[in-house]
Amino acid sequence: MRAKLLGIVLTTPIAISSFASTETLSFTPDNINADISLGTLSGKTKERVYLAEEGGRKVSQLDWKFNNAAIIKGAINWDLMPQISIGAAGWTTLGSRGGNMVDQDWMDSSNPGTWTDESRHPDTQLNYANEFDLNIKGWLLNEPNYRLGLMAGYQESRYSFTARGGSYIYSSEEGFRDDIGSFPNGERAIGYKQRFKMPYIGLTGSYRYEDFELGGTFKYSGWVESSDNDEHYDPGKRITYRSKVKDQNYYSVAVNAGYYVTPNAKVYVEGAWNRVTNKKGNTSLYDHNNNTSDYSKNGAGIENYNFITTAGLKYTF
């Protein structure tokens, strides 16, 4: 099934090119619309560690949480012809934002459901996050008051975090949660980056009644390629972890509502929910203290979900 869907994505440009050869392209001002908006980004991203030698069970998980990071978002769309549109969109954070990180380990194989080690880092920053999206739409219905179309595109997103200070509860070799303490305030503990690359397919549409308009978009990908980089800065455990995961699932739902203040200008609000589901992938580590490295197949997991709310202006030229 995924192979068939990927075939649709790859052959869409060919089909559109063939169709375009029978139509006349007209680059006129009223073929273009653009929008810009401001809003917030909230969500959580997760990294996991699995042990293949213990049946692939999860032994570690780090949850990076962020709330209400300010973002700016923009898009431009060009109607090549009544049936075909191309577009570009993207957003970026306007600065760093405070967050939170929790790191838990399950090292006791005889009691895998109970964590043995935990550290909490309330002094965590979302350093930056951004995304770009290139897409093409084919309109099945295209009337003055409503549109419905299929879409295909390519999207990339990035996230960067730094956790500082914090507290910990560890288990010694002889005990259980018996080592309690804290890290120096402001000292870097862990730095983490994620990147997601994906082709996708989707469905988009809108409906207008007088000066009010509702719209929505659904996107899906089964071909997400994600990667991450985890830097442990502890001088006694200076380790870099890098992981790659392929063919993850991605889901996105966006809904917007707007009002035309002039025939060409619309103010609107929008909410978008996005998720990349967890899947196992390969990981490597490099120990800077010992100059040693290791590699593990199916030893990592990467996941991300977020919610974006924006308010902005759309203008048709």
Swiss-Prot record:
Catalytic activity of the protein: Has a virtual requirement for Arg in the P1 position and a slightly less stringent preference for this residue in the P1' position, which can also contain Lys, Gly or Val
CC per GO annotation: cell outer membrane
Regulation: Inhibited by zinc.
Regions crossing the membrane: 32-41, 70-78, 84-92, 131-140, 146-156, 198-209, 212-221, 251-261, 265-274, 307-316
InterPro entries per UniProt: OM_adhesin/peptidase_omptin, OMP_A26_sf, Peptidase_A26_CS, Peptidase_A26_omptin
Pfam families in the cross-refs: Omptin
Active site as annotated: D103, D105, D230, H232
GO biological process, one term: proteolysis
Subcellular location: Cell outer membrane
Subunit-structure text: Homopentamer.
Note from the entry: Was originally classified as a serine protease, but it seems that OmpT could have a novel catalytic mechanism involving an Asp/His dyad and a pair of Asp. Encoded by the cryptic lambdoid prophage DLP12.
Functional summary from the UniProt entry: Protease that can cleave T7 RNA polymerase, ferric enterobactin receptor protein (FEP), antimicrobial peptide protamine and other proteins. This protease has a specificity for paired basic residues.
The name this protein goes by in its record: Protease 7
Species assigned in the record: Escherichia coli (strain K12)
Gene this chain is encoded by: ompT
